[in-house]
Amino acid sequence: MSVLPPNRSQTGWPRGVNQFGNKYLQQTKPLTLERTINLYPLTNYTFGTKEPLYEKDSSVAARFQRMREEFDKIGMRRTVEGVLIVHEHRLPHVLLLQLGTTFFKLPGGELNPGEDEVEGLKRLMTEILGRQDGVQQDWVIDDCIGNWWRPNFEPPQYPYIPAHITKPKEHKKLFLVQLQEKALFAVPKNYKLVAAPLFELYDNAPGYGPIISSLPQLLSRFNFIYN
């Protein structure tokens, strides 16, 4: 319960003035933070193919069994994924890997024990989309835009650590990758690289899963420059 002070006019309380003037307190404008990201047309990029790149696990059950075995040895799995954005007609599109007709994923994967997140993502991006002619792709990892946790050896993941979970089984970090103005990507033959517009991803967990469908919200804080 708050108590109001006595009548200020009778007790010497300053009335609507700063008793220190501007000598010690400076009036500052609100701080505005704006991140600018350059986007280039999809037609600026060339897409080739290379040998198939297969998953480590043959089934979902095998994936969780391996995760369980590795958790006992090295602890929580660390995963990183890259968000690559282009534009078509000034509409942002996210590059996704498509396997089959209904499965979509961001490029990335598991980090090795003790591996740096940024360097690990660069390694994984090169393995998945890197050129075959020996020219090194310069991946510019710009910003971490999301964190997701898997509390158990099961499919559900959350953008927070659920209550009473002290040992998550996997931590996934999403990084925005700033693409160069032009580039060549080599896509494994068993995948298709598709450009999905943000309006298609938005609120579309049934089609793309909870993580990819959350990208429009995660990316809304950026100011896109359409080159």
Curated annotation (Swiss-Prot):
Q: Which organism is it from?
A: Xenopus laevis (African clawed frog)
| UniProt region (Interaction with RNA), positions on chain | 102-104
How is this protein named in the record?
Answer: Cleavage and polyadenylation specificity factor subunit 5
Location in the cell reads: Nucleus; Cytoplasm
Gene behind the chain: nudt21
Superkingdom assignment: Eukaryota
On assembly, the entry states: Homodimer (via N- and C-terminus); binds RNA as homodimer. Component of the cleavage factor Im (CFIm) complex.
Q: Which InterPro entries match?
A: Cleav_polyA_spec_factor_su5 (IPR016706), NUDIX_hydrolase-like_dom_sf (IPR015797), NUDIX_hydrolase_dom (IPR000086)
Q: What does this protein do?
A: Component of the cleavage factor Im (CFIm) complex that functions as an activator of the pre-mRNA 3'-end cleavage and polyadenylation processing required for the maturation of pre-mRNA into functional mRNAs. CFIm contributes to the recruitment of multiprotein complexes on specific sequences on the pre-mRNA 3'-end, so called cleavage and polyadenylation signals (pA signals). Most pre-mRNAs contain multiple pA signals, resulting in alternative cleavage and polyadenylation (APA) producing mRNAs with variable 3'-end formation.
